[in-house]
């Protein structure tokens, strides 16, 4: 069963292309592909009996309830003027009444540099016990038969590019497929790109 805070502001919940609030495209509203990126928000309780670390490096005491939000944004520093987006994570805490006690609406910690696309699929349990992967938008659609089904897995995909452009007469990759979606890029500047799922 999915537990925890259910009344977060629309901009802080898991979202994908097709949602009313739009796909998450970083704090500037820009993305480097032709498709919008997703945002993943997770909630968990530390039941290990030991101290854990959240995505921003903060201590998570036993019994603490954590909310983490993964999203793309502009980097804090851009000395060359051509920095790509970064995958960032912002962490907060909530109490036993599901009230956020430590806000998590900041710009978070930078985890991975030069991420051009961030996509997620939710693995939900169907009534027959099997699992099916769907987008967050499909999951939140009230007419979908898997609306609010138990989430038992998350599939993550990213397209990452090189830090510096290629030099010389090189034909760049201008199209990559990620989780079934085609992402197109400008032909210049020329970057090495790779998709990960």
Q: Where are the model-predicted features located?
A:
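Short, structured beta-strand segments at or near domain termini in extracellular proteins/domains
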Residues: 196-197
């Amino acid at each position: 069963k999915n537990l925890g805070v259910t009344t977060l502001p629309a901009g802080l919940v898991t979202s994908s292309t097709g949602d009313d609030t739009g796909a998450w495209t970083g704090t500037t509203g820009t993305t480097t592909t032709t498709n919008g990126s997703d945002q993943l928000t997770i909630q968990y309780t530390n039941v290990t009996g030991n101290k854990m670390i959240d995505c921003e490096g903060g201590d998570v005491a036993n019994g603490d309830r954590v909310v983490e939000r993964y999203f793309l944004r502009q980097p804090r520093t851009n000395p060359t003027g051509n920095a790509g987006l970064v995958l960032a994570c912002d962490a907060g805490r909530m109490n036993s009444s599901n009230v956020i006690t430590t806000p998590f609406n900041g710009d978070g910690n930078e985890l991975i540099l030069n991420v051009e696309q961030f996509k997620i699929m939710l693995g939900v349990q169907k009534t027959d016990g099997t699992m099916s992967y769907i987008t967050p938008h499909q999951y939140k659609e009230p007419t979908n038969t898997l609306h609010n089904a138990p989430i038992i897995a998350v599939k993550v995909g990213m397209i990452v590019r090189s830090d510096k452009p290629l030099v010389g007469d090189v034909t760049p990759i201008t199209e990559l497929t990620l989780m079934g979606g085609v992402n197109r890029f400008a032909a210049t500047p020329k970057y090495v790109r790779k998709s990960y799922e």
